[in-house]
């Protein structure tokens, strides 16, 4: 009888050990899968000019883990998706051909003298960039980062999330770059406003703008200097 009891105890212990081992291994595999998944996405997002948006978007919507790991994965991916969308908005605004062509003789002829179309597009671009800058600032804050993680109380998973997302990041360089571009666009707006206000005092000849008044020419040239 005693021997049977010992055997039962041994079996129970082995089952418990096996169960614990199974879940430990499963957890390790899940964490490994999570780290690999996020690392691959981050690498694909490094070269933003060559980014495959559709491919990354699909990865950001899918999950490769379960349980609390899936909660972490979804939180990280939702955070990355919002960052990606903001960067895409900035990229789209910067790639608009109106910015480099706003102060060309061709545009003066096509959209002058009031430049309604050009000025509207430039204003929309300014607004998009300014809004995106504010979004980037908000996304960089710790409170915002943590708001993506929901229904997770275990400190281990919370710490893992913090580690993988990273601490509050600085967006000073991004802010400065956006501010510089917004200021550049505003300088272009100033030039177009000047030309619109003096619409009867200039024209385009042989691909160059000509003024009827040297004072206006000097003012125009000064505005161009301010634009650089």
Describe the predicted segments one by one.
Residues 1-3:
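Short, Lys/Arg-rich N-terminal segment immediately upstream of the first membrane anchor
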Residues 23-36, 72-91, 118-140, 162-174, ...:
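Charged, low-complexity, helix-prone segments enriched in Lys/Glu/Asp/Gln
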Residues 96-205:
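Extended amphipathic alpha-helical interaction segments
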Residues 189-228:
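Extracytoplasmic/luminal low-complexity segments enriched in Pro/Gly and acidic/polar residues
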Residues 5-7, 18-113:
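Leu/Val/Ala/Ile-rich N-terminal alpha-helices, chiefly Sec-type signal peptides and the beginnings
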Residues 12-15:
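Beta-strand-dominated extracellular/periplasmic modules and repeats
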């Amino acid at each position: 009888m005693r021997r049977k009891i010992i055997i039962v105890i041994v079996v129970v212990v082995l089952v418990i050990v096996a169960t614990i081992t199974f879940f430990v291994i499963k957890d390790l595999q899940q964490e490994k899968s999570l780290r690999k998944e996020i690392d691959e996405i981050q690498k694909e997002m490094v070269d933003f000019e060559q980014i495959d948006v559709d491919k990354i978007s699909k990865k950001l919507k899918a999950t490769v883990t379960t349980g609390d790991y899936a909660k972490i994965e979804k939180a990280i991916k939702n955070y990355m998706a919002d960052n990606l969308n903001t960067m895409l908005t900035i990229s789209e605004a910067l790639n608009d051909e109106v910015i480099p062509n706003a102060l060309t003789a061709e545009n003066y002829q096509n959209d002058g003298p009031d430049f309604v179309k050009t000025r509207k597009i430039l204003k929309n671009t300014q607004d998009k960039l300014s809004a995106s800058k504010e979004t980037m600032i908000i996304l960089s804050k710790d409170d915002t980062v943590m708001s993506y993680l929901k229904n997770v109380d275990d400190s281990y998973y919370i710490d893992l999330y913090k580690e993988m997302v990273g601490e509050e990041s600085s967006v000073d360089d991004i802010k400065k770059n956006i501010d510089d571009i917004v200021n550049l666009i505003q300088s272009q707006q100033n030039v177009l406003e000047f030309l619109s206000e003096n619409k009867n005092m200039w024209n385009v000849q042989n691909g160059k703008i000509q003024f009827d008044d040297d004072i206006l020419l000097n003012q125009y040239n000064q505005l161009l200097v301010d634009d650089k």
